[in-house]
Design a protein with these regions (language model features):
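Predominantly soluble domains enriched in secretory-pathway, periplasmic, or organellar proteins
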Residues: 1-207
Length: 207
């Protein structure tokens, strides 16, 4: 068998795509792409020397058209990504919550976080035109306090994240901290409705 390239997609407002995962349910609707490093927005050279204008970006590529469907600006970088078996959420690990540029700065905090994306809320906002068009694609602001995201603190420098075959549990593993954080995806609804706190979604954390 020979694998041939079917499509090359240019993703604006982002580079160093690290974690990448197709949507599981109800079909491969999206391909989720994590931006590991920040990029100046707009990325046309005008802000290249101004760190305050740099942003971390999460991208969803439409699996049928292979065009960028939308992007979400987040706090902190995005490492690996996965999604649920219900078609409601995607979630990504984030290290360097300090946004440091040296090893000492970027590993100083005892905790980083997992960023959870509410796909329905994002899609509704895009459909209503509640976005900025940057680089030709819809961009939403998902930084802390946004209705589109939640940030769940986890031990230092999480790396991998995977959904268990039971469709209920999500496991994020630490890279600098030898810890696995286990979430119950069924609690994410209450998290986004502000009925519980972020850490209330954690059901186990073996070290």
């Amino acid at each position: 068998d020979v694998m041939k390239c079917d499509k090359i997609v240019e993703i604006p407002n982002q580079y160093t795509v690290h974690g990448m995962r197709p949507q599981k349910y109800p079909r491969t609707g999206y391909l989720f792409c994590n931006g590991e490093y920040e990029v100046p927005i707009p990325n046309d050279g005008r802000h290249v020397a101004d760190p305050k204008e740099y942003r971390y970006m999460f991208t969803a590529v439409d699996g049928e058209t292979m065009k960028v469907a939308w992007q979400v600006i987040v706090n902190g970088n995005l490492d690996n990504v996965d999604c649920d078996y219900q078609g409601k959420y995607a979630f990504a690990t984030s290290y360097n919550s300090e946004e440091g540029v040296t090893l000492a700065e970027s590993t100083a905090a005892e905790q980083d976080w997992v960023t959870v994306f509410n796909l329905k809320r994002i899609e509704e906002a895009v459909a209503k035109g509640e976005f900025k068009r940057i680089g030709g694609v819809p961009v939403l602001d998902g930084r802390k306090g946004s209705p589109f995201t939640r940030y769940i603190p986890v031990p230092n420098s999480p790396h991998g994240i995977n959904t268990a075959p039971d469709g209920i549990h999500v496991v994020a593993n630490g890279k600098l901290s030898p810890t696995c954080t286990v979430f119950d995806v069924r609690r994410f609804d209450d998290l986004f409705d502000d009925k519980i706190k972020p850490r209330d979604t954690v059901v186990a954390e073996p070290e």
